[in-house]
């Protein structure tokens, strides 16, 4: 069975973490003195193992970075202040903003911390120390507040200029910034979680907050529509903000953001109810035309219970919803079908891989589960001496004091290429726990030599135990049996793409899962990937002895092209029909030969 092999890297110096000396798939940082007096009898052996794999055991404290002291300061900050935003500028730099105005920049090298910069330039200079949300760009910062009907606009008068933006971290004081405030409509004298979103052109901003029931609305002689609105459209131009339009959504919004393909479309997910009070979710499209925002499309998705989390794929053609009864709902726009699966945990967090092949579901209790985009579950395990994949990964067992998982996000470029030849590899999942620690989950996509008959170099996706290598220090008595993992399937480029997953399913003989994933792919937008995947499935089945089950699988595979749920574009049909007709002919001859043999 296919499964994902991972490593957990926690960026923490605290001794309250419970990581054993035989947990070779889990790492944290240590002080030098901990090696001298430790409850773990073989911690030194694990140190040698980590350093042999280029993982730092202790952090350097050289000037000017003083990484060890900076990380200790960050961990103390997370204990005492609320982190309101974490944003990845690129694959190497993460920015954290705290409610007090402290801005922290993290620089990575692989799964390891390379630099921590703590910037207190804004502390004491804002009208409130209860920041609700923020937008961070290279030219400006926009802040919203929990108890203020104002937005803070911080304009940089000096452009961020760096020949190596991935490694250089500048403080705000070096950018000569100017602070201004703008009044916005909304509920007064009420603590409100005002959220922000910006489009890719950076000329329009959305500010939104939850709806409040009419009977809870503060008394006023006349409440204008503007005051009752919960979604504001603001324009940004020439260093200024301006409220352009406002609207009150029909239902309570769960998520609001601008479209990635259409910068003047706003996509929302709103929790609604049907005629019989059954729970539903509305996927709405708003358009910004002539400085006005209006709803142009609503898709109603039936649910078994109230939605508590949601996520869209990068291509925005699939919407995933997590519900109170632990069900996970996937709505496919191009097929207009709804899939459902019961998760092993409460889906408080959902994150889709940028390649669009898998999605991760997490609970606040520190659990993680993986599904592919057909909602087939995929087992997972941390690197260990023994093969023991499970349905979920438990993080809280490493904490002496339970810590809530509040964010998980793939570390990826802001614009992820969907082209098959792209070399962008996304194998790090950022994890943030309430009050700390921070860390990443590394998906082990190891480089492998490709056989001569294959045309590309790549990575193994999933692994099986074959044999073990032994490693120990010269004076130690304990040995670490490092597993050598042998793939049953195809070598991939480690991008966790749908093609990678389907090839792995084939070589683990999970044909139904491969066909289901192929059925979830859109021939009109992913024609080449669909053709490669279908060819692999059909070729594999045609090499097997024909049975009623394999016959049905061949029909289902070819049916993704010949009998799709939604009609294919004429250009798609013309491009692939001749090649696919050859597979259909081979299938017919396969049936004919089997029929003659039986008679």
PLM feature segments, named:
Residues 1-418, 441-472, 477-493, 497:
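WD40-like beta-propeller blades
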Residues 423-426, 437, 444-447:
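Intrinsically disordered, low-complexity linkers and terminal regions
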């Amino acid at each position: 069975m296919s499964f994902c092999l991972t490593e957990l890297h926690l960026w923490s110096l605290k001794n309250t973490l419970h990581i054993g000396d035989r947990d070779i798939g889990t790492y944290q940082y240590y002080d030098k003195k901990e090696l001298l007096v430790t409850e773990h009898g073989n911690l030194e052996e694990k140190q040698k193992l980590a350093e042999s794999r280029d993982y730092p055991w202790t952090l350097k404290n050289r000037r000017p970075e003083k990484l060890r002291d900076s990380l200790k300061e960050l961990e103390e900050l997370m204990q005492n202040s609320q982190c309101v935003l974490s944003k990845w500028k690129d694959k190497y730099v993460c920015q954290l903003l705290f409610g007090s105005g402290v801005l922290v920049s993290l620089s990575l090298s692989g799964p390891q911390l390379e630099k921590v910069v703590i910037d207190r330039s804004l502390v004491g200079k804002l009208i409130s120390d209860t920041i609700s949300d923020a937008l961070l760009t290279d030219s400006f910062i926009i802040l919203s507040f929990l108890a203020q009907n104002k937005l803070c606009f911080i304009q940089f008068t000096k452009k961020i200029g760096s020949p190596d933006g991935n490694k250089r971290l500048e403080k705000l004081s070096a950018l000569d910034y100017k602070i201004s405030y703008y009044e916005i409509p909304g509920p007064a004298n009420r603590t409100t979680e005002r959220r922000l979103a910006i489009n890719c052109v950076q000329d329009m901003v959305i500010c939104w907050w939850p709806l409040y029931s009419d009977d809870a609305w503060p008394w006023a002689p006349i409440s204008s529509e503007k005051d009752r609105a919960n979604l504001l459209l603001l324009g940004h131009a020439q260093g200024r903000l301006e409220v352009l339009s406002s609207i009150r959504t029909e239902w309570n919004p769960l998520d609001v953001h601008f479209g990635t393909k259409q910068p003047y479309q706003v996509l929302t997910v709103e929790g609604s109810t049907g005629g019989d009070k059954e729970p539903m979710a509305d996927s709405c499209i708003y358009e910004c035309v002539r400085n006005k925002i209006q709803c142009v499309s609503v898709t109603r998705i039936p649910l078994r219970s109230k939605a508590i989390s949601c996520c869209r794929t990068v291509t925005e053609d699939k919407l995933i919803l997590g519900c109170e009864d632990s069900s996970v709902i996937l709505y496919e726009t191009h097929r207009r079908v709804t899939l459902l699966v019961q998760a092993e945990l409460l889906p408080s967090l959902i994150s889709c891989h940028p390649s669009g092949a898998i999605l991760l579901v997490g609970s606040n209790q520190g659990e993680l589960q993986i599904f592919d985009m057909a909602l087939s579950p995929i087992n997972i395990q941390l690197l260990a001496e023994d093969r023991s994949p499970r349905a979920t990964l438990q993080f809280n067992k490493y904490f002496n004091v339970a810590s809530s998982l509040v964010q998980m996000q793939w570390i990826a470029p802001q614009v992820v290429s969907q082209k098959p030849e792209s070399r962008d590899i996304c194998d790090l999942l950022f994890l943030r726990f309430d009050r700390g620690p921070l860390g990443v989950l590394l998906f082990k996509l190891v480089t492998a030599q490709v056989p001569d008959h294959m045309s590309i170099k790549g990575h193994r996706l999933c692994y099986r135990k074959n044999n073990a290598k032994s490693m120990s220090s010269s004076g130690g008595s304990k040995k670490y049996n490092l597993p050598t993992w042998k793939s049953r399937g195809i070598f991939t480029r480690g991008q966790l793409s749908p093609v990678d997953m389907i090839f792995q399913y084939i070589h683990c003989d999970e044909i139904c899962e491969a066909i289901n994933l192929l059925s979830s792919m859109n021939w009109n937008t992913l024609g080449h990937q669909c053709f490669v995947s279908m060819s692999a499935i059909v070729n594999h089945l045609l090499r097997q002895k024909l049975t009623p089950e394999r016959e049905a699988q061949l029909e289902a595979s070819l049916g993704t092209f010949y009998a799709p749920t939604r009609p294919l574009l004429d250009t798609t049909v013309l491009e692939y029909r001749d090649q696919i007709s050859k597979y259909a002919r081979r299938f017919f001859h396969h049936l004919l030969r089997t029929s003659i043999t039986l008679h």
